[in-house]
Design a protein with these regions (language model features):
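Acidic, glycine/proline-rich low-complexity segments that act as flexible tails and inter-domain linkers
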Residues: 1-87, 101, 105, 252-257, ...
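Glycine-rich anion-binding loops and their surrounding alpha/beta cores
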Residues: 7, 59, 65, 87, ...
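Alpha-helical scaffolding segments of alpha/beta enzyme cores, especially the outer helices
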Residues: 21, 55, 93-96, 163, ...
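Short amphipathic alpha-helical face segments that pack within enzyme cores
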Residues: 38, 93-97, 285, 289-292
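A glycine-rich phosphate/pyrophosphate-binding beta-strand-loop-alpha-helix module
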Residues: 40, 88-144
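Acidic, glycine-rich active-site loops and adjacent beta-strand->loop/helix elements
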Residues: 79-84, 109-115, 154, 219-220
Length: 332
């Protein structure tokens, strides 16, 4: 590790194979916490390259516990986190909204590292038991249209660095990696990122994959569509900037999206959304993220049609029914 750190401290970049080997060694416990923290710090001080990101991703995918749910052609809706905004669990609520609209979802999530509550915190608050049992996940897909994968059960490297990430309490390149390494290798993904360089980095990375995708970034720094400002959506062949008003929504304040101070607070907001008793801002932010996810799967539909489908899922109670069935099946 010493030679690698010297190389990085001299402002050099890693080759793809070097990055791959480093992450494999981290997962195998070959470096101590100080060395790993030093490595992480380098990537807090400069942007990661495409080669480095792909190498780290290669290692995680090679070491993952594979899960074959390809027959469902599912979508994952996921953000990098690390935007410092402490929003409520927008992507998790969007996942159940999309599942309620009839589209299979496989959510890959974790505990919050830089926020009060990650997707796994919300699931735990509802009594969900995490599992790596593929048969159980397949039943969940068949009966609920959604399955949940708790990242540490499938990515040993993520588990190995979890205490270091929590101790640093700032975004790291592992925030960038999480959305890229869903063990299912879903057919579709809606990915949220916290800055424009990462939007382009993700777009380059996904263009060499078979995944049908969209990458979103709110221009005021959110790693999801927040309706607080203009936002950019990038797909394989297109980039477009949208405004909230252009899609029929109001423009909201940061405080409208606050996730609270505890996982219990975040779970309460999540429940209000599913019960269709949330604030207008909370509901509409979930709707717009769900709508762009639906459009990834159904590109023949206009975004206005996808917004209508997402709203209907929440307002009809189908999203809530999906959640209730999911909790019942997965709390045993």
């Amino acid at each position: 590790m010493k030679q690698i750190l010297y190389k990085l401290f001299e402002h050099q970049y890693l080759e793809r194979d070097e990055a791959r080997t480093i992450l494999q060694n981290i997962a195998q416990g070959k470096y101590n916490d100080v060395q790993v923290a030093s490595l992480i710090t380098v990537f807090l001080m400069r942007n990661i390259s495409v080669e480095e990101l792909c190498g780290f991703r290669d290692a995680l995918l090679e070491m993952r516990v594979p899960v074959d749910l390809s027959e469902f052609a599912p979508i994952d809706i996921v953000g990098t986190g690390g935007d410092g905004k402490n929003t409520f669990n927008i992507s998790t609520a969007a996942c159940f909204t999309v599942a309620g609209a009839g589209i299979p979802v496989v959510k890959h999530g974790n505990y919050g590292a830089t926020s009060v509550s990650g997707a796994s915190n919300v699931m735990e608050q509802h009594g969900v038991k995490f599992t790596s049992d593929v048969d159980q996940m397949r039943r969940s897909m068949e009966q609920c249209n959604i399955a949940y994968l708790h990242a540490p059960l499938f990515n040993p490297a993520l588990k190995a660095v979890a205490p270091i990430r929590k101790g640093l309490a700032v975004r790291t390149f592992f925030n960038m990696l999480g959305p890229l390494v869903n063990p299912v290798l879903p057919t579709y993904q809606l990915l949220g990122v916290y800055n424009l360089p990462l939007l382009r980095l993700y777009t380059y990375t996904y263009q060499e994959s078979k995944t049908k995708f969209a990458v979103v970034h709110n221009l005021d720094g959110y790693d999801e569509i927040s309706l607080t400002n203009e936002f950019k959506v990038a797909t394989c062949g297109n980039e477009k900037i949208y405004t909230p008003e252009g899609l029929g929504f109001a423009r909201y304040q940061d405080t409208d999206l606050d996730g609270g101070q505890t996982p219990e607070d975040a779970a309460k907001i999540f429940d209000n959304i599913m019960n269709n008793t949330a604030t207008e801002a909370q509901k509409n932010v979930v709707v717009i993220n769900a709508a762009f996810a639906i459009q990834v799967v159904r590109p023949e539909k206009t975004i206005e049609e996808c917004i209508a489908l997402a709203k209907e899922s929440l307002e009809s109670g189908r999203a809530l029914a999906t959640l209730k069935k999911f909790i019942e099946l997965n709390n045993k």
